A protein has these predicted regions:
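A general structural signal for well-ordered alpha-helical segments in protein cores
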Residues: 9, 26-27, 57, 67-70, ...
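Compositionally biased, low-structure terminal segments
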Residues: 9, 80, 110-112
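Non-catalytic accessory regions of SAM-dependent methyltransferases
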Residues: 1-36, 40-42, 46-49, 59
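Conserved AdoMet
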Residues: 31-103, 107
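Generic signature of intrinsically disordered, low-complexity segments enriched in small/polar residues
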Residues: 11, 48, 82, 125-127
Length: 127
């Protein structure tokens, strides 16, 4: 029976066999539901979840089962230590784009960058 953080994480992970990182996704989704960091979540494995917390968390797991990106479930994606709002209408910033920015910032100045609005706008904002 799912009653505390640890049992919910175990259940959630078992529900996500077709995602790349079921444990990570489970932790991120539950931490978000409880308004905790992942570190805080791990320190509270014995915390009993309320019925409303379980209901919201299970709904988020169902969304992830349907292959909805974690960032869209959360409503944001962290990029260069900044949270950017995302939804189904925005391309989620990818980690590979951070490498692109690091490479560009190491280029000799001056240089020009053109961002044609093909995503979330993180390139224009960060650069």
């Amino acid at each position: 029976m799912v009653s505390n953080v640890k049992s919910f994480l175990n259940w959630s992970q078992s529900q996500l066999p077709n995602v790349l990182s079921p444990r990570l996704d489970s932790e991120v989704l539950l931490a978000h539901t409880l308004n905790l960091s992942r570190t805080q979540l791990r320190a509270q494995f014995d915390r009993v979840l309320s019925d409303s917390e379980k209901k919201i968390a299970k709904k988020n797991v169902e969304r992830r089962q349907n292959r909805e990106p974690v960032s869209q479930i959360l409503g944001y994606q962290e990029f260069w230590s900044i949270n950017f709002v995302v939804d189904k209408n925005v391309l989620t910033p990818r980690p590979e784009t951070e490498i692109l920015i690091e490479t560009a910032l190491n280029c000799p100045s001056p240089f020009k960058i053109l961002d044609l609005g093909t995503g979330s706008g993180v390139l224009a904002i960060i650069m």
